[in-house]
Amino acid sequence: MANVTAAMVKELREKTGTGMMDCKNALNETGGDIEAAVDWLRKKGLSKAAKKAGRVAAEGLIALDVEGTSGVLVEVNSETDFVARNEDFQFLVRNIARVAIQQGLTDVEALKGAHYPAGGVLGDAISEAVAKIGENMTLRRAALIHVPTGAIGSYMHNSVTEGLGKIGVLVGLATEGNAEAVQPLAREIALHIAAAAPLAIDASGLDPAVVEREKAVLAEKNAGKPANVLEKIVESGLKSFYKETCLLDQVSNYPEHAGKTIGQVLKDTEKAAGAPVTLVAFYRYALGEGIEKQESDFAAEVAAAASGQA
């Protein structure tokens, strides 16, 4: 049996919203594997993990910059939210986004080596900011969408100032028709993505491992049923999964679209555009997703400081 610690139980509880004893049992049953424990709880019908499993915490800012038919998102992490509210840090993050869009760069190492407006290279500007502010900072990722003809939709949720916030969204709609007719829809879809958090444009874009994991959960949840019945249940469950996770299959959250999917709304817009409209790409950056936030023992820190060890 794995050594299940209180910290592990706490982490699983935060991910799933499940009671402490159920979390402890799940960890014991899965050898202390957090992700396996999430699935174990889902299979037992004890978890809200489908909605909460992706919740993580990290500090910093997402920056959004749009220039014509190009848009960029960047994420820069800091150790504390206090630094994220620092004007010098905000200035740096905004300039990183500007460099990315002007030079068409998304590779982190290439960005660090790019020319910085104030002189030198961007990597040096980050190092200087670390020295000045006194806290470590990391340029984590960047994404760029360019549509030669069409529209860029963007949205920043939990904005701390213009173009900076906690959740940033970019979406690109390509059309040879009237781009102005498409622009309002691009904005609507960006807001939809922020709220609905799709994983891919359609089923073909989903990670095969994610699909297989969902199949396994559905199969085990319905274990014992005849094979032909189980096959239909899994097939039906996957269709529901695609409606939840694939952008074109999701129902628009705008009342005026009357229950239509995003794919159907795009088709409707083609009449006004006078040409086909294609959703070519989207990005949704939530600050800190996929990062494990280090937790410190405050009492131990105080004791260490008092004894001169800190």
Curated annotation (Swiss-Prot):
One of its GO terms (molecular function) is translation elongation factor activity. GO terms for cellular component: cytoplasm. PROSITE patterns: EF_TS_1, EF_TS_2. It is found in: Cytoplasm. InterPro entries: EF-Ts_dimer_sf, Transl_elong_EFTs/EF1B, Transl_elong_EFTs/EF1B_dimer, Transl_elong_Ts_CS, UBA-like_sf. The keyword ATP-binding does not apply. Keywords: Cytoplasm, Elongation factor, Protein biosynthesis. Residues 80-83 are annotated as: Involved in Mg(2+) ion dislocation from EF-Tu. The keyword Cell division does not apply. Belongs to the EF-Ts family. Associates with the EF-Tu.GDP complex and induces the exchange of GDP to GTP. It remains bound to the aminoacyl-tRNA.EF-Tu.GTP complex up to the GTP hydrolysis stage on the ribosome. This is Elongation factor Ts. It comes from Beijerinckia indica subsp. indica (strain ATCC 9039 / DSM 1715 / NCIMB 8712).
